[in-house]
Amino acid sequence: MAEAAGRSGGRRRRAAEGSKTQDKKVASGQSNTGTKPDHPPILKVDDRQRLARERREEREKQLAARETVWLEREERARQHYEKHLEERKKKLEEQRLKEEGRRAAVEEKRRQRIEEDKERHEAVVRRTIERSQKPKQKQNRWSWGGALHSRINNSDPDRRSVSTMNLSKHVDPVINKRLSSSSATLLNSSDRARRLQLSPWESSIVSRLLTPTHSFLARSKSTAALSGDAASCSPISPLSYKTMSCRNSADRAKLFASTDAVGRRRTHLAGTDKKEKERDHLSSNFSANLKGGHFSSNPKARSPAPSPVWHASKSLPSLAGTLKQITSPPGSSKVPSTQARPPSPGNIRPVKKDTKPENEKKRAEKEAEKANEERTEGSKETSAGTGESANQEELAVQAEDAQAASPSLPPAPPALSPPPAPMKTSAGTTDPEEATRLLSEKRRLAREQREREEQERREREELERQKKEELSQRIAEERARREEEEARRQEAERKRKDAEEEREKEERLRRQAEEREQKEREEMERIQKQKEEEARLREEAERIRLEREKHFQREEQERLERKKRLEEIMKRTRRVEAVDKKPNDQQNGHISKANNTGEAVITSPAPPMEPSGGPQLQHATQSPHSGKPVTCTHTIVSHQPPMNMDSNLNPEKNTEENGMSMQNDNFEEIINLPIGSKPSRLDALNNDGSDSPGIPLNPILAFEDKGTLLPQVDSVQTHQTAEVI
């Protein structure tokens, strides 16, 4: 009996342990089934896709707004640039117009200044011509006295006879006396010729005129025959000499005044004008001294006068040879006539009135020509010409000193004069036809000289006009060249600025295009990354879904396998019950009642996913406090891990364990309930979720009063527990 009690106690302990394990499994199954509906993963993927789509739409809207802002900014920049270009073009146009107006004003001022200079020059020339053409109130008498010499002026060499300068080596001493003043005049004219350059044509004319003519020799011989005494040829009183000197001094003052006026007009030729005035002054003094020496009333004073002058006249052939080498302006080959040659008695006749305007006209032309020569050709003198002029001036000064000292000198020795020629004494006067012919010859020579001077003047004026035109043309060309250079420079500057602006614009557009491409590339990369992320999320969601489906299929397969195993177990259990039912009814006949009233075994298993399913076992016990039967409900869930699947017992072993000896009628069963301060979770919760009645923790003696043992119930309980485990 003790052995049977120990065996039943071991079975109860194992049943309690199995119930604990089943409670834990049921609790874990409930926790798993309770957390599944809270977080559905498929709905989360849809929400993520929807949120991603919303974010993408929002980003597209932001990009569109940003692109609109960029386009507006570019439009404003383009409008600002165009406005800046318009303002710049307008400023350049205004500057160009101002420059053209300024240039036109400067050109107008320059033209007015040229006009004023031209008018002033014309006025000066006109005043000079008027002053030169003003008639001089002088006595023009043809006499043997000093009045004849009063109309002869240093500034009018054209009225002198040209043929009287053709001095040759005559032997007549009377001719030497008469030609003393002519030699002095020739010395003065040679001084001018040294300073003035002669053309070859003019030099040939001068050489031809230097040869003496037959009429001159005949007139000289006739005059010498008429005048027995040299003193009677010039009955000049000291008073007339003084008058002549005063008149010549007045003429010299006028000449110096006109020369000073010309010098004031030409300030840049002041040095040349000064030299010219000095030379004219020396020549005037020399001529005046010669005149004074020739017309002196002392016969002794007139005799030695030709000696120093005759030395100069003897050097005339060499002087004529050197005229071609003098560097002076052309147009001045005027050979003055004799200054103090008294006419022959046959030539004494009144002066014609028509010669005076002609002489005045020649004088005016001569002064105008002299002014032009001083203005245009004064700067062309060379150092050689200056040296020769200085030598000539020294010679003139020496001759003047000799003339001044001549009254106190003794008469010159006759060896100094040329050998005397045979005197031809002829009575009577010179033929009037010869005098007329000589006068016409003089007029013809004067006319030719005047025409030649007029032609030279026209040539000089033409040359000056050409020079002025060339100068104005050069000035205009230079101005045009400067304007063209300025225009080219401005054009190059404008092109450079336009190129810089175009380059800046292209650079700005290129930077904008690069920035736009960079932003588009970044946006495309971001969109690509977003698409890749979405694809990765979709793949992950698909993988999770497939894993869940596989997991569900595996669980379903496991559930079906467990169901099959349970069905097999239940089949074996029914067979065992069918075998053991008949002996139990025979031995304990009252057990069937108890089973019908207080105990029911439900073996219909439920699926493991249902929380309320599972076989239930109702065991009737008696409460120790009240003695009333208490119903205990045990829920057994067939969901167990695969590691517990190997704990199934063999049917034979189960038969041995459940098979009890029915020989012993006196059997008591002790049920071991779980011992602890806290009941199991399966016992604490029933199907409705409410607390079950309290279970006593102390062991209960079954059937204590009646002493009846229920082996069938115990065997079923133990067998069921073993099979489930």
From Swiss-Prot:
Annotated family: Belongs to the MAP7 family.
Location(s), subcellular: Cytoplasm, Perinuclear region; Cytoplasm, Cytoskeleton
Compositional bias of kind Pro residues: 408-422
Disulphide linkage map: none
Stretches of the chain forming a coiled coil according to its record: 71-131
Residue spans of biased composition, Basic and acidic residues class: 15-26, 36-73, 86-133, 271-282, 351-380, 434-539, 575-584
UniProt cross-references to InterPro entries, sorted A to Z: MAP7_domain-containing (IPR051483), MAP7_fam (IPR008604)
Region (Disordered): 1-73, 86-163, 261-539, 575-631
The keyword Cytoplasm is assigned to this record: yes
Entry GO terms, CC: microtubule; microtubule cytoskeleton; perinuclear region of cytoplasm
Compositional bias segments (type: Polar residues): 324-341, 381-392, 585-598
Protein's gene: MAP7
PANTHER family listed in its UniProt record: ENSCONSIN, MICROTUBULE-ASSOCIATED PROTEIN
Natural source organism: Gallus gallus
UniProtKB keywords: Coiled coil, Cytoplasm, Cytoskeleton, Microtubule
Signal peptide: none
GO biological process, one term: microtubule cytoskeleton organization
Role summary: Microtubule-stabilizing protein that may play an important role during reorganization of microtubules during polarization and differentiation of epithelial cells.
Protein name: Ensconsin
